[in-house]
Amino acid sequence: DQKLTLEIARVIRLGFLQQNAFHKEDTYVPMEKQLRMMEIILHLYDRCKALIDRNMPMALLRESDIFEKIISIKYDVANDKLEQLNLYDDKIEEFYQHLMAENA
């Protein structure tokens, strides 16, 4: 559980708080995008917590690239294409379902 907290803190630090003023998408991020990014990070936490509660090791969760995908949201989704953020919720669900099926 503590390892998950540290991993989510890393996602928040790198994917949400750290800013690159020289990057086109990161110079200014609309409030709506910021809110959706935090909702997606919370969704990731909730799904990972559910997996850990089923005794899946954090190392197994880290084998996936889901954490890196979430970190890269602000660069991968243009500020004028916020509907693409919904795809990340789908990716988290796929990640969750895959691990549940593989390790049930």
Where is each model-derived feature located?
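Conserved catalytic/coupling modules of large nucleotide/cofactor-utilizing molecular machines
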Residues: D1-A104
